[in-house]
């Protein structure tokens, strides 16, 4: 039997060794997990487990976890948060107690065991967490040997036919730790408004369609950013060097020239290949400091000619954004800083300055310009699509809106501004954060598609991603289309015979890799946060209620961006029911109410870096009673309709009692 790679990469002849433990035996068309090694002049694969049968039926489940010895037997403690069972290991081989491993589930449904196929060694936060998420989502770190050879042969760009922008003081504005600089900006005042330039690294010059670099970039789809490492879409020689818009170094770029009026409206635009020389590598913080009057040696000489015009143009663009009613949701990010020793140095909520919004608005308008140019040319385009919320989702929140005396219009007339109005009405109330969270959950997931459907959240009819080709494959596709649209020199454009029918498949693939990256980043953050919180076991925290379910209360430690669960069993003894679209957990006997956004006191009882889980127990501050130790248990039941009237949100009822008892009030 001969095997080929499942990801569709160039076929290799791999001979398959037999494994009598896999029953029924492997057949043609089956997919399996195995270890490949060279024997003589041939490649042989030793199968460990079948992953799917011919036709796509899933045969085995891949899991990760820690090996635990219990007496004479070894078990796998899964790393998944929702795992309810540990699995008996049929053979640990050379693994030891405490090793972090990957395994396949085998055996009957009711008596599943786990078989180890990869050992990462003793559990180590940096190594284990990274390996787990990367392997789980099929994200590869190392580039094939062919990529290194092709990168070494990358040609030097020619200045011929390119706009010379080396004398224009374009600057890059990025985070403190950024290493790949793919965008630079410039603004100058005019009689009617502003001239803007957004220069983006000319990745298409180096990554040609159909090349090994192109195939690998497509397979990855995007870069993945973990606290302790970056898995780049492109090799470091390109991402951090040849394509990176380093200061004082000539670099190839594709520049978007835009004219806006004083109200921030985009009046005209054009794209050209260019040569630029970044005047400075600035950070968001130092740009904001300069605008606020705190200069350093670098920004003092750039303020009048560069930084001040950028802000003036941004204020105009912000007017246009507000006028069109882009969705204004505050989604906080957590920043986890890892030291050179691999230990967590600090955890904090990421700061957001006006300088972040400045860069964002420049990029958004360049993206709009790219989408409009390509739509007019009728070229194959990979749009960034964000559709309106589904009608069914909107119907689910109607009872909540009635309680707030609000109403959203029917879907065809629905605009982001209607959600902004809802946020304004709820601002300052304890549950305002809950409304923001609810609005976020209502939104459709943004994706890549050749369909020209617009971007609901930004309030834009035309939108595509053009500004980050170093880390996003769809942006590279837009660059190639622009090169073709303008017949730019130096090649690398969309091929004449580009198959439009493939664009839907490409869009699905890069949307999937984006979702995988988000999941990998989220899971990694959770595990690092759990490790960071471990020394605080037994400590009490003021936590904000960020979710309510039949399982209990989700509680956020806002200063750290960490979230854990307060299980229902740790709540005061009562019968609880969810009300107002899950915004209230109401105790039917006591009248006690827990509401989304309330701040309560909770004690950290578990912090597991293996799963990324945090478990708290509820503590009543008012009377000093720890209900977990007291032995009281809360229970959840679904109350039949009509059994008890639901109070409107904001009415005193049990909510006021809960605040008095906990000693907390948002007002």
Go through the PLM ranges and name each one.
Residues 87-88, 109, 174, 181-393, ...:
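Feature marking long nucleic-acid-engaging regions of large polymerase/nuclease enzymes
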Residues 1-200, 204-250, 281, 286-289, ...:
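Charge-lined substrate channels and their catalytic hotspots, especially those that engage the 3′ end
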Residues 131, 145-149, 163-166, 268-272, ...:
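Short coil/turn segments at secondary-structure boundaries
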Residues 165-172, 176-190, 310-327, 523-542, ...:
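Phosphate-interacting basic helix/loop segments used at nucleotide- and nucleic-acid interfaces
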Residues 9-12, 26, 369, 392, ...:
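Structured C-terminal cores of nucleic-acid metabolism proteins
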Residues 107-110, 114-115, 149-153, 293-315, ...:
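A short, charged
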Residues 5-9, 18, 78-82, 107, ...:
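A short beta-strand motif that forms part of the nucleic acid-binding face
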Residues 29, 98, 116, 173, ...:
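A residue-level signal for conserved active-site and pocket-lining positions in enzyme catalytic cores
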């Amino acid at each position: 039997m001969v095997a080929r790679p499942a990801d569709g990469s160039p076929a290799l002849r791999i001979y398959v060794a037999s494994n009598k433990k896999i029953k029924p035996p492997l057949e043609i068309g089956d997919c399996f997990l195995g270890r490949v090694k060279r024997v003589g002049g041939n490649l042989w694969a030793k199968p460990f487990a079948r992953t799917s049968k011919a036709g796509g039926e899933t045969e085995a489940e891949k899991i990760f976890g820690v090996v635990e010895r219990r007496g004479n037997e070894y078990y796998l403690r899964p790393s998944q948060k929702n795992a309810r069972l540990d699995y008996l290991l049929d053979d640990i081989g050379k693994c030891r107690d405490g090793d972090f491993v990957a395994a396949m589930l085998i055996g009957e449904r009711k008596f599943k065991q786990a078989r180890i196929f990869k050992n990462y060694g003793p559990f180590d936060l940096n190594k284990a967490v990274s390996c787990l998420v990367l392997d789980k989502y099929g994200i590869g770190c190392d580039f094939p040997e062919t990529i290194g050879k092709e990168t070494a042969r990358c040609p030097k760009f020619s200045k011929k036919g390119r706009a010379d922008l080396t004398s224009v003081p374009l600057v890059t504005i990025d985070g403190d730790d950024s290493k790949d600089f793919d965008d630079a900006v410039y603004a100058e005042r005019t009689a009617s408004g502003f001239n803007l330039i957004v220069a983006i690294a000319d990745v298409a010059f180096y990554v040609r369609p159909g090349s090994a670099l192109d195939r690998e970039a497509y397979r990855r789809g995007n870069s993945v950013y973990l606290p302790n490492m970056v898995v780049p879409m492109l090799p470091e020689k390109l991402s951090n060097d040849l394509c990176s818009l380093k200061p004082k170094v000539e670099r190839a770029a594709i520049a978007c020239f835009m004219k806006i009026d004083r109200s921030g409206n985009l009046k005209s635009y054009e794209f050209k290949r260019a040569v630029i020389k970044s005047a400075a590598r600035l950070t968001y913080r130092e740009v904001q400091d300069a605008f606020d009057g705190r200069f350093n040696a670098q920004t003092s000489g750039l303020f009048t000619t560069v930084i001040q015009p950028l802000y003036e143009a941004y204020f105009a663009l912000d007017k246009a954004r507000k006028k069109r009613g882009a969705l204004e949701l505050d989604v906080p990010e957590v920043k986890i800083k890892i030291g050179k020793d691999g230990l967590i140095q600090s955890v904090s909520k990421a700061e957001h300055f006006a300088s972040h919004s400045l860069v964002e608005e420049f990029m958004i308008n360049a993206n709009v310009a790219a989408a409009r140019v390509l739509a007019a040319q009728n070229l194959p385009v990979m749009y960034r699509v964000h559709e309106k919320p589904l009608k069914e989702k909107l119907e689910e929140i109607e009872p909540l809106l009635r309680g707030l005396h609000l109403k959203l219009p029917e879907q065809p007339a629905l605009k982001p501004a209607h959600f902004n109005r809802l946020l304004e009405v709820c601002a300052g109330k304890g549950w305002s954060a809950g409304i923001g969270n609810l609005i976020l959950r209502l939104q459709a997931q943004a994706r890549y598609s050749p369909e020209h459907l617009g971007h609901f959240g930004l309030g834009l009819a035309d939108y595509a991603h053009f500004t980050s080709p170093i880390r996003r494959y769809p942006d590279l596709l837009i660059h190639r289309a622009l090169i073709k649209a303008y017949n730019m020199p130096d090649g690398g454009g969309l091929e004449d015979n580009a198959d439009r029918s493939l664009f839907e498949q490409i869009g699905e693939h890069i949307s999937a890799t984006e979702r995988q990256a988000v999941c990998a980043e989220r899971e990694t953050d959770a595990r690092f946060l759990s490790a960071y919180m471990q020394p605080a076991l037994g400590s009490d925290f003021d936590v904000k209620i960020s979710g309510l379910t039949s399982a209990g209360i989700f509680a956020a430690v806002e200063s750290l961006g960490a979230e854990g669960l307060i299980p229902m069993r740790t709540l005061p003894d009562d019968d609880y029911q969810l009300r107002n679209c899950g915004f209230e957990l109401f105790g039917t006997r006591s009248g006690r109410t827990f509401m989304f956004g309330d701040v309560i006191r909770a004690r950290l009882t578990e912090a597991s870096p293996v799963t990324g889980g945090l478990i708290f127990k509820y503590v009543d501050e008012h009377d000093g009673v720890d209900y977990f130790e007291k032995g009281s248990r809360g229970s959840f039941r679904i109350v039949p309709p009509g059994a008890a009237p639901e109070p409107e949100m904001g009415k005193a009822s049990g909510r006021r009692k809960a605040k008095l008892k906990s000693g907390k009030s948002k007002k």
